[in-house]
Regions:
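A glycine- and charged-residue-rich anion-binding loop/surface
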Residues: 1-189
């Protein structure tokens, strides 16, 4: 939603939400989320905490983490972002996906993609410490993604139904796609 996006841009401050300054010296994040729900070899390229680039965060800190690759879908086009965890274990059990039983657990509650195609994982470090250069397991909440996919498909069905019933002049003007609801904006004449 707009408030969350504004807060995300505000959190970056002068670090360049547009991607001009933020991560200019690093490659774009590779999105692997169409093929994988979890990967165990994501490298931490950058960390931002309290509006500053930092080398390390410790438990209890809110931060933005940029990875070299990610299975997390970023918020865009009205579709909300994936949630999940960055952990230190390749164990894909439910406990690991919830960040339990690991020395390191970073809960991801928002993901934004900047103009430089860096995926910024917003969240809180629940346990341990996380450093630039660390390799982590990145795991999405698969139930949440499935619910978002259903809502996304519903927007396409709604668009087709409106065009069939009201005519070809109907056009989608926007949408909001979340796990538990969707909003479909359209123009009619």
């Amino acid at each position: 939603d707009k408030v969350r996006a504004r807060e995300a841009r505000k959190a970056l401050g002068d670090l360049g939400w547009a991607g001009v300054e933020f991560g200019q010296d690093m490659p774009a994040t590779e999105f692997v989320g169409y093929d994988y729900d979890a990967i165990d070899d994501a490298k931490v390229l950058a960390i931002v905490a309290d509006g500053e680039h930092v080398d390390e965060i410790v438990a209890g800190m809110d931060a933005i983490v940029v990875l070299d690759q990610t299975p997390f879908y970023a918020e865009m086009g009205g579709q909300t972002a994936d949630h999940g965890y960055l952990c230190d274990s390749a164990d894909e059990s439910v406990e690991n996906l919830e960040g339990k039983g690991n020395a390191l657990s970073f809960e991801v509650n928002n993901v934004q993609k900047n103009k430089g195609d860096k995926y910024m994982h917003y969240g809180k470090l629940l346990r341990g410490s996380l450093k630039v250069g660390d390799t982590v397991t990145a795991s999405i909440d698969t139930e949440r993604r499935a619910a978002i996919r259903r809502a996304h498909s519903a927007t396409h069905l709604l668009d087709a139904a409106l065009m069939k019933i009201l005519g070809d002049h109907v056009h989608q003007a926007g949408s909001l796609v979340e796990p538990d609801r969707l909003r479909f904006d359209f123009s009619h004449f």
